[in-house]
Amino acid sequence: MFKGDKPGKRIMITAGVHGDEQNGILTAQKLARELEGQSISGCITIVPTVNLSGIARHSRDFHSAAPDSSSANLNRVFPGNPNGDDASRYANSLWENLLKPNADLAIDLHSQTSGSAYPLYAFADYRLDDSIRMARLINPDVILNDPGDPGILETVYNRADIPSITIEVGIGRYTDLEMIQRATTGVQNVLKDYQLIEGDVVDLDPPCVEGERITSVRAEQGGFVICHVELMDLVEAGQKLATQYNSFGDEIQTYYSPIKATVISHNVESVRAPGSLVVRLID
């Protein structure tokens, strides 16, 4: 927690809600190091490792110590329930005692999950001016107009009248130093623009892709999938996206784009189970 000696906004920066999304964690840690010794107005709180049980297991989920409990997606149970299961109680304790009381604004740092990649990608509820403002200051490749879903930390913040965004910092599990630096610079832009720290906002690149609809192309069957597109490619309806092979290397499936859209995610691990993500599109 960085408490300023001058009045200002209180911003909460979280990471590690999903334990295998390490670029978000590394971004939060880097940001904290770079804030050391700076003049601060208001208060900046950084929680870099929300889901320690998942981080220890390289797992997306929250894992209970109780032998009769199943793992849970922590980012689907906020604000939690003090009388619920252990994941719900944990989320509620965090929300009521740390996350909500210390925030006028919030940024939740993630990455794509293991096996797939994202660009620098922001979720923002366009009904909230501060959410749009923060998302564009991040200088991402993509912004999704995201009204939110129940249980997601960003949504719970927004519904509590605390403007929030989610930032996806590239690939799942594996370290991407360039993406971490971009995300750190983006969060610093937010801090500067809201006058929590001194300095000028880094000039923004040309406008990013902003969309309202996500289309996910998923594996029809198990096998090995090779993608033929890259992140941020603009694809046409009917364009080939990926080819799938069986255990013997025989071609068994071809995947095509159902719409004209921009590629924002694709698998980076070839083994795909039925229903696993192959390519994700935004338009």
Question: What function would you assign to each model-found segment?
Answer:
Residues 1-283:
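Structured catalytic-domain cores with a bias toward divalent-metal coordination
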